[in-house]
Amino acid sequence: MNLQEMNARKEKIRNFSIIAHIDHGKSTLADRILEQTETVSKREMQAQLLDSMDLERERGITIKLNAIELNYKAKDGETYIFHLIDTPGHVDFTYEVSRSLAACEGAILVVDAAQGIEAQTLANVYLALDNDLEILPVINKIDLPAADPEMVRQEIEDVIGLDASEAVLASAKAGIGIEEILEQIVEKVPAPQGEVDAPLKALIFDSVYDAYRGVILQIRVIDGSVKVGDRIQLMSNGKEFDVTEVGIFTPKAVARDFLMAGDVGYVAAAIKTVADTRVGDTVTLASNPATEALEGYKEMNPMVFAGIYPIESNKFNDLREALEKLQLNDASLRFEPETSQALGFGFRCGFLGLLHMDVIQERLEREFGIDLIMTAPSVVYHINTTDGETLEVANPSEFPDPTRIENIEEPFVKAQIMVPNDFVGPVMELAQRKRGIFLTMDYLDANRVNIIYHIPLSEIVFDFFDKLKSSTKGYASFDYEISDYRPSNLVKMDILLNAEKVDALSFIVHKDFAFERGKVIVEKLKKLIPRQQFEVPIQATIGNKIVARSDIKALRKNVLAKCYGGDISRKRKLLEKQKAGKKRMKAIGSVEVPQEAFLSVLSMDEE
C-alpha cells in the first residue's frame, strides 16, 4: 500500500467505545453491532460475545477490554472500518476505561430509558470528555413499559450538558435503532489524526498472555506503521523485541501484513514477561524511535489490600504462578510474599477495589483450582511516628508499637450517591454511621438526588455498597474517587484465641467504635469456631487492654456414665482426672480457625 492509499484508508477509520452503567445494555448493543455489520455469523453468535471470560458472563459485567474490527457499508455506499473498543462500566475498573477511551475518537453513551443517568455513567462520561471524545447519546431499552425517553433526554442535557436532541432511541435487545447508531458513528465520530509516515507511536491499552506466543499487546497505532520483522522498543523501559505477528481481532485473532496509524489491533513479539509491558506505555521502532511518549498514562495504585493464603501450604508456589499469570492480563494487580503465624506463607495483594478483589479470588479458585483463605481487606494508612518518620502500612500486623505513634492518617474518598428522593434519609443515616462528612446535595430532577460525602475508604471497603443497596431497595447508584489523607483517631485491635494472638484477625478500627466492634467480633467468632476438647477463651484487645471476651465451652465426655450410684469420692476422682487431661490438652492444643471467621471480621454489622 502506498502512502496515498494508506491516508485514504485512514479517512475511513472510526474508533469508538461504548460507555454505560452496569445493566444498561452495553454488551447487548455491542452484540447487535457485530450482527448488523456481519462480523460474526448468526451461528457463532452467543449472548455477550465480547465478554469472553466465564466470570464476566456470569456476573454480567465487563472486566477486561476487548477491541474488535468491523466493516460497515454505510448509506453513502462507502465501506468504513470500525474499531469497537469495549469498556468495563464498574467503578473499580475506571483505569481500564480511561485507557480504552484514550484509544478512541468517539464514544456511544448508553442510558437506560427507564432508569436515566447513574453515578458510574457520569464518572465515565467525564473521563470521555477529558479525552476530548465525540459523545453520541443513545437511549436504550425504549421497548420497556417503564421507558420515558423524553425525560431521559432532558436529563442528559441537564446533568451532563450534552445536546441530546439527536439522541438515538434504541432497543439493543429488539434490534431497534442499530442502523441509526452506525450512521451516526460514520457522520459524527472524527477519523483518526496522526501521520502515516511519521515514526511509529502506538499506545498499549491491554496485554494478554498466550502460552505459545508470549505476551500479546493490544495497541492503538497513533502515528506510523508496524509490520512483522520490525524491532520495536517500549518507551518506558527501553526494552526491545522483534515483532513476530501483527493482526486484528474480529473477535478471533486474524493476522495482517501491517498495522498503520488509526488501526487498533495486536502485536506479538516474543515478550516473555508481562512485567516488561506496562499498560499505557508507548511502543515505537528501535531503528527510528519517536521523540516523546504519549501522555495521559499513569501507574495504577491499588487502594485495597488483603492477604491471600493457600489452604494447603504446599500450594504456595502454585499460588505464586497463578498470581503471576493473572498479573499478565491485569496490570493493576500487585502482590508480594508475606508470612503469618496463623496462616503460614501467602501473599499480600493490592486491588483497585472490592469487585476487583472478588474477581481475582474467583479466578484463582476457578481457573487455577487453588483453595484460598483471604484475610480482611485493609487500606493504606500513613502513620506519623514520634521520631518524625512517616510509614505507609497496609497490613494491620505491621503497625508499630502504640507508644511510637504520633498520629494516623487514613484515606478518604469523595463518594457520589445518586438516589430517589424517598431514600435520602436512609442514605444519609448510613453515611453518618460510616463516619461520612456531608458535602453537598443536588436535585437532578423532581425525584432524584445526587448526594456527595467524604467517607473514609476503610468504611467503604467492606460492606458499604451492599448496605447502600439494601437501604435503598437497590435504587441507589454509587461512584467514588480517592480525595486525600486525613488524621483519624484509630487503634489496632488484636484477637487472642487461647491467649495467642491470631495475626490474620487483627484490624484497625476507630476508637469510638472499638468497644462494640470488639464485642460483636468476639461473639461472632464464638459461633463460628468449632468447639474443641478444651475451653477456648476469645479476647479482643487494644494494646494490653482487654475490651471484650467470650469463652467457647469445651466438649466433654460424660466420664460418670459407668458409675451406677457409686461413691461421691470415686466420681470426684474421675472428674479430677478428666480436668487434668483437659488442662494438658489446652497447653499444647491449637485452635482451627475456619475461613468464615476471617471474613466475619469484615462484615461488621452491629447485629
UniProtKB/Swiss-Prot annotation:
Catalysed conversion reaction: GTP + H2O = GDP + phosphate + H(+)
Membrane topology label: Peripheral membrane protein
Enzyme Commission number, as recorded: 3.6.5.n1
Entries under PROSITE patterns matching the protein: G_TR_1 (PS00301), G_TR_2 (PS51722)
Disulfide bond positions: none
Subcellular location per the Swiss-Prot or TrEMBL entry: Cell membrane
Domain spans labelled tr-type G: 11-193
GO biological process: positive regulation of translation
InterPro entries in the record: EF-4, EFG_II, EFG_III/V, EFG_V-like, EFTu-like_2, G_TR_CS, LepA_C_sf, LepA_CTD
Top-rank taxon: Bacteria
Keyword Hydrolase: yes
Official protein name in the record: Elongation factor 4
Organism classification: Bacteria, Bacillati, Bacillota, Bacilli, Lactobacillales
